[in-house]
Amino acid sequence: KEYTDDAIVSIAENLDFLPASQSARWEDIGRKKYKKLVRRLCDVYDYILIDAPAGIGKGIESILDLVSRCIVVTHPLWVSLRNGARMIQVCQEHNIRDFAIAFNAVPVDGEDIDLYDMLEVLRAEYVGAMIPYDEDILTYTQDGHLLDLASHEFRNVLAPLVDYVVTGDCWEDYDVQKQFDAYVTKKKTDKEEACTPTLASAGESIFGDSNTVLYINRGGWTTQRLLVQGKQSLWRRRKLK
């Protein structure tokens, strides 16, 4: 108990985190000790989310003996969907009928992802969330930083999943799709605005004419800078000769 209390990290108000051991494996801990640990945590917390190891093994079986509902995380890839379908089958074999699907890293550019096609492959009915692929999330993960959902668009995307965790009720699938589409639309709009060049503005040129028009966009690109770089490159080539 003392070791567990020391290992628990407070993340935010009403949210604690117990990191996995970096040395002990599931096989080393054993089912009995693991169940004892989770039951001890149940006496302290209202909700416990367990990040299960990938695949289907003894670790999953130990978890399924304890949980009241499952979130099956999968990707919009054929292999991942097949694995997700197998995970659902394992849940049913353990008499767990309360589960929701969380589609992770769903592409937002150039690919048409059909929610109902994925559900058909999984033979599932309830959707917990459609989580879009976002490079910012990868950066946060690599750097070990937490994402502030209060000021991020992911807050709305994850709202259906949070409701499922708290209440056990799933949103209608079209409402989940609507949240995802709204996120994608906003991202595309922000991207288009960032790439749109500004109008021409007066500025000094490399030719010394103060009235020469200097084209600048929001990314910092300028015709002046390119011309200067071109002249410098030409000068270097001539000097080398």
Each PLM stretch: what is its role?
Residues 1-43, 140-143, 147-148:
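P-loop/Walker-type NTP enzyme "switch/lid" segment
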Residues 23-24, 55, 77-78, 105-110, ...:
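Conserved nucleotide-binding/hydrolysis micro-motifs of P-loop NTPases
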Residues 42-59:
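Glycine-rich phosphate-binding loop used to anchor ATP phosphates in small-molecule kinases
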Residues 59-77:
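Inter-motif core of Ras-like GTPase G domains
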Residues 84-95:
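Conserved C-terminal guanine-recognition region of P-loop GTPase G domains, centered on the G4
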Residues 107, 119-146:
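Beta-strand-loop-alpha "switch" segments that mediate conformational coupling across diverse proteins
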Residues 143-241:
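NTP-binding/hydrolysis catalytic cores, primarily Walker-type P-loop NTPases
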